[in-house]
Amino acid sequence: MQSSVYFDQTGSFASSSDNVVSSTTNTHNISPSHRSSLNLNTTSHPHEASGRGSASGELYLNDTNSPLAISSMLNTLALGSMPQDIASSNISNHDNNIKGSYSLKLSNVAKDITLRECYAIFALAEGVKSIELQKKNSSSSITSASLEDENDIFIIARFELLNLAINYAVILNSKNELFGPSFPNKTTVEIIDDTTKNLVSFPSSAIFNDTSRLNKSNSGMKRPSLLSQRSRFSFSDPFSNDSPLSQQQSQQQQQQPQQPQQHSTQKHSPQQCNQQQVNSSIPLSSQGQVIGLHSNHSHQDLSVESTIQTSDIGKSFLLRDNTEINEKIWGTSGIPSSINGYMSTPQPSTPTLEWGNTSASQHGSSFFLPSAASTAIAPTNSNTSANANASSNNGASNNGANQALSASSQQPMMQIGNTINTSLTSSNSLPPYGLMSSQSQHISNMVNTSDMNITPQKQNRFMQQPQPEHMYPVNQSNTPQKVPPARLSSSRNSHKNNSTTSLSSNITGSASISQADLSLLARIPPPANPADQNPPCNTLYVGNLPSDATEQELRQLFSGQEGFRRLSFRNKNTTSNGHSHGPMCFVEFDDVSFATRALAELYGRQLPRSTVSSKGGIRLSFSKNPLGVRGPNSRRGGSGNPNPNVNMLSSYNSNVGHIKN
């Protein structure tokens, strides 16, 4: 070998006192573990029998400052490894190389334990030399007096390596019921060095698991690159572990801002409930601020929902459930923020009335008090806000309203109020599928300009008032909807007069329209002719009828529908070319809700024929005018009585009589 030749040729260097370190000092400074790793075993050196050269080579190897020793130490270190890996590798190497006799003692065990059970406990342990079942008297040479337990029976397992004893001691110490539920006491685990008779401390199970998991994660991590910053022109390996780690970090960063937003939505929901209660208890004149708060919360909720729903972009709209589609269409989440702002923002032309106003009861001039020349004040009762407002004013508002109505029963201003109410309910800007009751149609049918003490110019002015945007129907309980005052008064006194029984039934029928009916209505395709897109009313137009259709089969088809009232059937006139366009049919129902359900259920129904029509089934749409009513001024009337004076007087007297009772 070159080293031996080198050592033999440099005798002067070996004999020099400046460069040679004594072997006693070197062996004293180097630990036994480092000796074995550096191959500094003096007894097994290959140059042991070579006289002077062997002595010089031995001294040179024992020198820690020699280049060979330094190179061997560097070879044992992993290049680019983390400091944790270096420390753990040194500790593991040190533990693995510490050999001796270590006893693992299990005390506080069951008294009836056998040696077979002791072997079963250590069946999965490695490096076990012997297992004994001893008593306290016979184990006095092994344990000290401080280690004695109350139980005089214990198990001793001897290990050769300390790390194996520590590993199994941690496993046994983590078991609370080592001997099953019949012996619930926790077993005491101790490690004793047989040479020194001292206890050897070992980590607890939680710390040991954390350190082992950390070591595994550190060992499995990719060696960090020397280049901390990569160039944007460099190619990135798609199979490296960096990309999934970066994706997970980005996902965690996206989820973290979403969590406080979800908490904010949960915090907003009780606030909205409280605001709804406040909205139902305050006067209508001061509801603008609360409505503004509703709009602000709606904007926040929509922004939160838009951020949460970004994860569902990849889902196809056709794969969604019908209920989810209906919620998107009819729920508040599907309404744009601008429309929601229009819904909740009160317009200046919105008619309002304060039920608890003392001036109305003191003056007694009229139930309707015009506040300006260009604006009309009419009673506005909604299902949630105004109705709760009228019932939550401690009875004072009800007394004021009753006095005002009794005073107005002998004055002509009640007629003006009915006219104003008619102008509001019969506006031409009604939304599609708006839900109005038959009572509003009945009241609008009562009103005629020739019977009212009001000029046509005033009525036209009332008719030209823009419809408030918040009268667009949304299927929610917190959205105010316009309901005529006669509905409220008649439903309140329905148990006192039999004439209001049908009215209350119509009210419950209109309020009982559910989201399922609206979902059925949403599936109906829009009419091909834009002229057929009429606002909802209680009358349906039946189109696309075959030329041989009869009134009997249509009556049989529609009479089974709930709320069916009557049917009008007639054939169209023959044109000059001799062609007939088929019969024409109108079907009237008790309420708009019944007409809506019938339209949703019977749209596209085929009449029983021997051959299937190529034009498809019947096409239903809302009629331009209710049955028996002509002209735009009195549309939406639900009664076929040609004399509106009788309807007006009878309804007027019945309403006043209900309030007096």
UniProtKB/Swiss-Prot annotation:
Bias (Polar residues) ranges: 32-44, 648-661
Biased composition (Low complexity): 14-31, 237-272, 383-409, 496-508, 628-647
Span of domain RRM: 538-625
GO biological process, one term: pseudohyphal growth
Keywords for this protein: Cell cycle, Phosphoprotein, RNA-binding
PROSITE patterns: RRM
Protein name: Protein WHI3
Species for this entry: Saccharomyces cerevisiae (strain ATCC 204508 / S288c)
Encoding gene per record: WHI3
